């Protein structure tokens, strides 16, 4: 293959160009690959190779680029050196000319002339998509018109600022100093001048006790010829309108229509915080000053005049070198399927028959296989007959014809017509039958995990296969990938976006399902695909949607054709609230709550109670009952009455109840189960929510026996994503839960809002799958008429930081320019906010390109600030804990609580730390311990402690995924090892975790006043959230050791409350949770509102924060330097550890602490498992209990090595348990197995105690502690130099001992060493052995050790990456059963 590189070099040489190769290592140490990209100037395409060695990677990249040159007719295919045949360019239409001009890339409209923006585009684009693959930057459809003006003006201003050598305070002038106070007046002035009638449109959200408002407005700007839009949220109408005006004014400012605010900004004086006296020991102050000197930092002297305070923060000490500004608008590279490329792993196929097979050969084999299967498999024939009956079948020929002739096609079909499962199969089977199987690979996106998995399993069943052959799926934490050619992969949109970094290579068709849902990822993907279609007209995009108005999508994709698929025609009769009351003769129960006085909502409530509007055709009783129901509440009693009414109809069928959010589902489930009628065997009540485990989710599809009614309580997940065939009745609350975010005050609100008419139409369609159905809408007809037609796109109500990072990672050009091309572009102020946040985090450099830190953050599926916190956690060797806390923030709390406040059983998890985050960490640690004893123990633990097991399992998955990404980015594994934390006594590692948390959640800082009352930024009032461990019971007052807290998010209800709170010391705030620190010599001011009484010199040592940030810069460039930091940096880190201790600020956590109920925690033994189930030394996971081949001893999970009982009693049958007796893992005299004994024999010290000692070994004569030295001491290795191995005799675990004569280098936190001793392997004989770091992948060179039947849900290999056994495999123990 080498001559392909020479061919490309020669071709470029003739044109006076040189190919530029860029190569980097990817994957983990055990299966390292090399990714190579080759670019040639003037071509907007990167050839890619991903192989096991550098040479092949370069050759494959060169071949990919040459194939691209063939496709765009720059090179003739017969000139290309052989080996792997280049597929001919796919034929677009009947024309023989395969040169695709841009005009052909824009499919012809379905009738009538081209609309003006497209006619202009076609003219501009005639030179279009040639060598560059994209055309000039000019001809992008100017949806976000005039954004270019903003960016070009911004560049001029940057140049001017540089000339004046003026340090600009970016934040103050970020939006022209326009604030909530001054924006509305300026907007009104603008309206008067331009003679605009500006009216706010208000929507009320939430129930009465928690009411808030959304204000929105669209205005047309004459001088720019475009509209701008704002939609903001506030606790009353006045605030919502002010926020909406602020967004509009900021956008007008950025577009150059209005000036910056030049008056004095009047800040509302918040409540003053009294100066807090900080006690700092002289020793620590001296240590601080020494570090500052060592780091060569300058301390600002105190001011001469106290009324002129000085700023103590110093600027950044280290910057990333600015990379070259990317001027070309990027596009994600695409190439058709090729012979030796696997699109699902984005790598070349280097070995096996497929590495050298031609596309013709592959196509022939697959056709023969399908033909044989059709003839022989009788089940398949009956499934085919079922498929024939689906409504979409009649449209098969029309769909295939449209897809063949157009780059983009929209298929619109009623729910249940079969489009999701059938369209991909029609395309695939068409290619296979026409001898083009190797030219077809289809990716299908779904908005949710449950639908991606359920649809993939259904399609595999219809093809007579298991997932993993022609059909597979990939969702976060779980994948079964299909074969590399002629296959369909179902995935979530998020997973596809992560795969885009390697391009859409080897994929012939991209199908985007449920486009009407308008989540932020789908909207982002549509912009990417639109650009891809312009650059590569041969790609095929199919957009699928429910029966809604698709005009907007059709125009966005150049007036592409729409195919209408009609569904099964079982009618669905719909009823509204007044009908439901009349039918059931429902009388609402008397209200037991006294109504609170209405707070001032800032104006008239125009969102009238529609329950007072009832037509004359209904009786007076109905009108009265209806008027007594509160529109904002979900009437459980009426749902109950409807279920009883359904019983009387004697029409069997499942009932699907749509409810907004998990809380209502859980409450409704308990409400029904506690009712003697619905809790009986005649009913099966099933919840359906994205957060419940897959096994639970699957139950909703299972049929129930005769005489049993299945009632499914679901969120909008069942609206479009999945189809439950036996549903006949739908009861619809007509509501859904949305997350609203307001940027200017960093406020989150989870509001229950009315669903849109489109949503209600979808929900209605779920009934009537098998027979005529019934839909009961729990809203009045009057309310229905007032509903919005569509929901607001998520892009308008969520921060854009993560999407902005993805844009830069995929090299798609400027963030603003890219988002301006969205189907509905987000407001400009939100884009600028995101760019600014990323610059502050050092994720973007001076040219707005990704820094090495930004590149790591872009790969982590988590909020960028948390990502940086995780990197800092790795530097301090507490990476695992920080990853756990970050993962836990992605999910609801695991506590199952009846009331709003947590009970003692949950508060206990916080120990003495006054911290919700520590409670989460402790819960996770305790659950992780419990599950080591098997699944039954895990279930028992969760029931006893009232914890949601599903949430804990998903947190584990997310944590492991985050750690894997960091390890693959080059971070040493030993900085991510699991540690044991104590929440009841001193623990410096936990102190450091809390310091880093203060950085991660900044600017969310608050000060406790009394009872639940706290002050947040700028002294504004708020409350401790009732779900916090810090929330006092009833009205009792609480005294905390420190009044300062950091918190996860501000939730706006009637009041503003802080959720997820952790107590911090003032020194932790000073160091990690501050932006502006000033001193007048006596008092230090943090961010203009917190005042500390601390010496100027001590406070000035805040400057070491800059040194810490500089270290993050260096570590991001080269993560492996963490394990060999220079003494100055080590000294700085140790000083930060000291500052993080509560005692450093004179705070005693034991004071004021109330310990509830359970008494002190028993001592724990150390764990070094990398979170992967390889725990408690050697017995817990992997090969100690059930794992590989059933483990060593008999016994169950932890029965392992000895014959003894379970976890505590095991390992050495008699005598103490695992860490009982004289001490645990690394403590004093005792060894691993307690007392004086070794693991299962006599002898001296054990694992970490003493020096290894004599004869007693793991399984007999030689072994673990044998030979010269012990664990890390002196000459001997892990198992000493002796002959015995793990299982005695010569063969044993590692032949010549665990690490041969290597020794075991031990630095404070590192356990690195080579585990692959001499001759013996795991089962003797093989030459491999455990050759890797202590908590990583355990794979010997010659064989891997997966339990034969085990594996994560049966798939083999821990988390499908071969981490020691499985994760609750089939047998939890015994031979071949799996285990951890």
Swiss-Prot record:
In what residue span(s) does the Helicase C-terminal domain sit?
638-811
The listed locations are: Nucleus; Nucleus, Nucleoplasm; Nucleus, Nucleolus; Cytoplasm
Per the record, residues carrying N6-methyllysine are 148
Residues of the region (siRNA-binding) are 5-9, 53-55, 184-188, 236-238
Q: Where is this motif: DEAH box?
A: 513-516
- Per UniProt, the ranges with Polar residues bias are 125-134
**What are the coiled-coil residue ranges?**
none
- All copies of the DRBM domain together span 3-71, 182-254
Q: Where is this region: NTD region?
A: 1151-1366
For the region Interaction with BRCA1, what residue ranges are annotated?
Answer: 232-327
Annotated region MTAD: where? 333-382
Omega-N-methylarginine: residues bearing it:
1176
Q: Where is this region: Necessary for interaction with RNA polymerase II holoenzyme?
A: 257-666
Deleted gene: phenotype = Mice are viable but have behavioral and neurological abnormalities. They exhibit hypoactivity in novel environments, tremor, and sensorineural hearing loss.
- Entry domain remark: DRBM domains cooperate for the binding to nucleic acid but not for unwinding helicase activity. The helicase-associated domain-2 (HA2) region is essential for the duplex RNA unwinding helicase activity. The minimal transactivation region (MTAD) mediates interaction with the RNA polymerase II holoenzyme and stimulates transcriptional activation in a CREB-dependent manner. The oligonucleotide- or oligosaccharide-binding (OB-fold) and the repeated arginine and glycine-glycine (RGG) regions are dispensable for both RNA-binding and unwinding helicase activities.
Q: What is this protein called?
A: ATP-dependent RNA helicase A
Q: Gene symbol?
A: Dhx9
């Amino acid at each position: 293959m080498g001559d392909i590189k020479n061919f490309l070099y020669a071709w470029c040489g003739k044109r006076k160009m040189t190919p530029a190769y860029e190569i980097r290592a990817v994957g983990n140490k055990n299966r390292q690959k090399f990714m190579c990209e080759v670019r040639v100037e003037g071509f907007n395409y990167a050839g890619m190779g991903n192989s096991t060695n550098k040479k092949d990677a370069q050759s494959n990249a060169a071949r990919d680029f040459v194939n691209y040159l063939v496709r765009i007719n720059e090179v003739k295919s017969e000139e290309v050196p052989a080996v792997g045949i280049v597929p001919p360019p796919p034929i677009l239409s009947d024309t023989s000319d395969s040169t695709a001009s841009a005009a052909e890339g824009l499919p012809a409209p379905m009738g009538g002339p081209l609309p003006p923006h497209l006619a202009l585009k076609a003219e501009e684009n005639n030179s279009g998509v040639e060598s560059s693959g994209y055309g000039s930057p000019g001809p992008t459809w100017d949806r976000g018109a005039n954004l270019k003006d903003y960016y070009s003006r911004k560049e001029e201003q940057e140049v001017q600022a540089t000339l004046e050598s003026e340090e600009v305070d970016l934040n103050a002038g970020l939006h022209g100093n326009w604030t909530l106070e001054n924006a509305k007046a300026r907007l009104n002035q603008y309206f008067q001048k331009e003679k605009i009638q500006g009216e706010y449109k208000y929507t009320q959200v939430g129930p009465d006790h928690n009411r808030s408002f959304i204000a929105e407005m669209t205005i047309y700007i004459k001088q720019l010829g475009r509209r701008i839009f704002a939609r903001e949220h506030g606790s009353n109408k006045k605030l919502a309108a002010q926020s909406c005006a602020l967004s509009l004014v900021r956008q007008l400012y950025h577009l150059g229509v209005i000036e910056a605010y030049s008056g004095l900004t009047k800040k509302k004086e918040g409540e003053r915080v009294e100066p807090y006296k900080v006690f700092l020991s002289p020793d620590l102050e001296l240590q601080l000053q020494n570090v500052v000197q060592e780091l060569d930092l300058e301390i600002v002297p105190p001011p001469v005049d106290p009324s002129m305070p000085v700023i103590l923060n110093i600027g950044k000490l280290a910057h990333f070198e600015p990379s070259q500004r990317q001027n070309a608008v990027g596009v994600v590279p695409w190439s058709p399927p090729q012979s030796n490329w696997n699109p699902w792993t984005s790598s070349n196929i280097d070995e096996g028959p497929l590495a050298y097979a031609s596309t013709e050969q592959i196509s022939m084999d697959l056709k023969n296989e399908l033909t044989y299967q059709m003839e022989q498999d009788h089940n398949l024939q009956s499934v085919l007959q079922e498929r024939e009956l689906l409504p979409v079948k009649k449209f098969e020929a029309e769909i295939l014809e449209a897809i063949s002739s157009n780059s983009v096609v929209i298929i619109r079909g009623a729910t249940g017509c079969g489009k999701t499962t059938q369209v991909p199969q029609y395309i695939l089977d068409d290619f296979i039958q026409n001898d083009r199987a190797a030219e077809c690979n289809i990716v299908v996106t779904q908005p949710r995990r449950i639908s991606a998995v359920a649809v993939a399993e259904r399609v595999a069943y219809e093809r007579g296969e298991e997932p993993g052959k022609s059909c597979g799926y990939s969702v976060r934490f779980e994948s079964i990938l299909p074969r590399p050619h002629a296959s369909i992969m179902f995935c979530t949109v998020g997973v596809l976006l992560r795969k885009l970094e390697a391009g859409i290579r080897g994929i012939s068709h991209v199908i985007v399902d449920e486009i009407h849902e308008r989540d932020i990822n789908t909207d982002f993907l549509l912009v990417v695909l639109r650009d891809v279609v312009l650059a590569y007209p041969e790609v095929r995009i199919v957009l699928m949607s429910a029966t809604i108005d698709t005009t907007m999508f059709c125009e966005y994709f150049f007036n592409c054709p729409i195919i209408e698929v009609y569904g099964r025609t079982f009618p669905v009769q719909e009823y509204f609230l007044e009908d439901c009351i009349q039918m059931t003769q429902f009388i609402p129960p008397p209200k037991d709550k006294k109504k609170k006085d209405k707070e001032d909502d800032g104006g008239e409530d125009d969102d009238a109670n529609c329950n007072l509007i009832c037509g004359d055709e209904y009786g007076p009783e109905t009108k009265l009952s209806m008027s007594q129901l509160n529109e904002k509440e979900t009437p459980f009693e009426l749902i109950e009455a409807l279920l009883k009414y359904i019983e009387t109809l004697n029409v069997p069928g499942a009932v699907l109840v749509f409810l907004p959010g998990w809380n209502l589902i859980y409450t409704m489930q308990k409400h029904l189960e506690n009712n003697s009628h619905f809790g009986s065997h005649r009913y099966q009540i099933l919840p359906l929510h994205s957060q419940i485990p897959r096994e639970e989710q699957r139950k909703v599809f299972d049929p129930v026996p005769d005489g049993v009614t299945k009632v499914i309580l679901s969120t909008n997940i069942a609206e479009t994503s999945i189809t439950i065939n036996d549903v006949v009745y739908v009861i619809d609350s007509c509501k859904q839960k949305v997350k609203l975010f307001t940027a200017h005050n960093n406020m989150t609100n989870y509001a229950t809002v009315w669903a849109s008419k489109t949503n209600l139409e979808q929900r209605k369609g779920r009934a009537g799958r098998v027979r005529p159905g019934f839909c009961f809408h729990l809203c009045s007809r009057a309310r229905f008429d007032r509903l919005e037609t569509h929901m607001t796109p998520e892009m308008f109500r969520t921060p854009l930081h993560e999407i902005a990072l993805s844009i830069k990672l995929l090299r798609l050009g400027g963030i603003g320019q890219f988002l301006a091309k969205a189907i509905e572009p987000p407001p400009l102020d939100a884009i600028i906010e995101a760019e600014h946040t990323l610059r502050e985090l050092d994720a973007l450099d001076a040219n707005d390109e990704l820094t090495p830190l930004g590149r790591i953050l872009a790969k982590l599926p988590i909020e960028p600030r948390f990502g940086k916190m995780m990197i800092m956690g790795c530097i301090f060797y507490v990476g695992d804990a920080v990853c756990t806390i970050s993962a836990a923030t992605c999910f609801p709390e695991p506590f199952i609580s009846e009331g709003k406040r947590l009970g003692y059983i949950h508060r206990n998890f916080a120990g003495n730390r006054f911290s919700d985050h520590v409670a989460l960490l402790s819960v996770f640690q305790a659950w992780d311990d419990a599950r080591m004893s098997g699944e039954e123990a895990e279930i028992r633990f969760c029931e006893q402690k009232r914890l949601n097991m599903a949430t804990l399992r998903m947190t584990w998955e997310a944590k492991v995924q985050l750690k894997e990404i960091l390890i693959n980015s080059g971070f040493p594994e030993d900085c991510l090892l699991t540690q044991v934390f104590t929440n009841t006594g001193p623990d410096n590692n936990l102190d450091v975790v809390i310091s880093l948390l203060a950085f991660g959640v900044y600017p969310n800082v608050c000060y406790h006043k009394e009872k639940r009352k706290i002050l947040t930024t700028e002294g504004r009032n708020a409350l401790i959230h009732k779900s916090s461990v810090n929330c006092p019971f009833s009205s009792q007052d609480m005294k905390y050791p420190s009044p300062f807290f950091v918190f996860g998010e501000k939730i706006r209800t009637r009041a503003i409350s802080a959720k997820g709170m952790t107590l911090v010391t003032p020194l932790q705030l000073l160091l990690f949770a501050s932006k502006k620190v000033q001193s007048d010599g006596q008092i230090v001011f943090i961010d203009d509102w917190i005042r500390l009484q601390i010496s100027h010199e001590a406070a000035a040592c805040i400057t070491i924060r800059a040194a810490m940030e500089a270290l993050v810069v260096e570590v991001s460039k080269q993560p492996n330097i963490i394990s060999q930091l220079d003494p100055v940096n080590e000294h700085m880190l140790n000083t930060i550890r000291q500052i993080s201790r509560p005692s450093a600020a004179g705070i005693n956590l034991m004071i004021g602490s109330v310990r509830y109920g359970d008494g002190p925690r028993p001592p724990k033994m150390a764990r070094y498992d990398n979170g992967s189930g390889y725990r408690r030394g050697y017995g817990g996971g992997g090969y100690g209990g059930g794992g590989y081949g059933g483990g060593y001893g008999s016994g169950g999970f932890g029965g392992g090595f000895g014959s003894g009982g379970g976890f505590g009693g095991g390992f050495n049958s008699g005598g103490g348990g695992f860490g009982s007796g004289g001490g645990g893992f690394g403590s004093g005299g005792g060894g691993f197995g307690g007392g004086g004994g070794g693991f299962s024999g006599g002898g001296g010290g054990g694992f970490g105690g003493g020096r290894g000692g004599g004869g007693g070994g793991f399984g007999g004569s030689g072994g673990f502690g044998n030979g010269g030295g012990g664990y890390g001491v002196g000459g001997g290795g892990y198992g000493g130099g002796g002959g015995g191995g793990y299982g005695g005799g010569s063969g044993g675990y590692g032949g010549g001992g665990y690490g041969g004569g290597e020794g075991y280098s031990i630095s404070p936190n590192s356990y690195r060493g080579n585990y692959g001793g001499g001759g013996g392997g795991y089962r003797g004989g093989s030459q491999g052995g455990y050759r890797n770091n202590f908590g990583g992948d355990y794979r010997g060179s010659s064989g891997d050790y997966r339990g034969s039947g085990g594996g994560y849900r049966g798939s083999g290999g821990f988390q499908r990456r071969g981490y020691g056994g499985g994760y609750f495999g089939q047998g939890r123990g015994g031979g071949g059963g799996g285990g951890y």
